[in-house]
Amino acid sequence: MVRLDALPPSLPVMTAAAAYLAKTYLYKAYHQDNADSHEVTSLSTEDLVKVVQYTDNAIMSAGGYGLESDFHNNFRPEPQYENGVESLWAMQYSMNDGTNNGNCNWSYGLIVPNIPGVTDGGCDFYKPSQNLVNAFRTDANGHPLLDSFNNADYNSQSDYADPRLFLTVGMPGFPYEFNKNYMMDQSTTWSRSNGLYGYYVTLKQNVDPDGDYLIKGAWWGSPMNRIVLRYSDVLLMRAEALIQLNDGRIAEAISLINEVRNRAKQSTAMIADYEMEYGVRFNIQPYTGSYSQADALKLLKFERRVELALESERFFDLVRWGEAAEVLNKFYAEEAADCTIYTNASFTKNKNEYLPIPFAQMSASNGNYTQNCGNC
């Protein structure tokens, strides 16, 4: 018999399984029973209770996991940060392991931007939007501008901002991957196709060009793990379930959100000189007071967006909540002013939420499958 707690951290164990179960039950809780639409028709109390159960017993109460002291530690390639306290399970990558870079993370190769003197022509995919950058704006109380964040573009000299912005998005006027040898600017030097796709780059999936962890060549790779499930996601899943249950534990849900926000507040090790050097104004504070279910849910949804930005969660959250069409069509209309590729973009409600079942599978089912709305 193999002891699960004796397995190497690269293998998923009971906590990872519990987190996957919790996420599955959370999605399952939002019933979309109308075959002709993806509207949320009801919420399953039973499934929401399961989310609370699995996040507590198998993860939080079991111990051994928690939030990293600094948000950025989750996105560093150095071995001492891999499989850390926040990583419930991560896809494992390595270098200098006796292979011809066969175990490196090549999946982020197309994300590397045009770094002058390093890549000179990176593919620069997976671009953060202006809308996302604006979402990190905060008010004088250190709280997000829930309804007005996109009324104006973020101004680094006058706006308050959540520190996670500078650990998530590379922006003109700031060092790329915290290396002052590579100051980003709003030019074709740093952006693909003359800025057609905007001038922002993701920091979470990239590494320091001068460090030991960027494999250079025709393609670019690194040994940085890709975290599939992390503890902050677990906290926010649990908070969402508690809010939706609305059984008197909204204060507990807010405290979980505040755990994530308080960690963000202290996540300034890599950007400690940004306020003095670049004039930015960090301001993030926990929530105080009491909140209605509707207000708490709004806070939760916004927190998921900024905490998990560029980690491939946002679209699926919007589909789960039945909000994809409303949010994305508004996004396209507003973002087109900054990024012209969105000029004719649209999201078709009750179709684009899901991909259709492949034709081969439909044919092999002998009529037992019913095609979903993705093929409408």
Name each model-derived stretch.
Residues 1-106, 141-376:
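Acidic/polar-rich alpha-helix caps and helix-coil junctions
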Residues 131, 137, 141-144:
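Glycine/tryptophan-enriched, flexible segments
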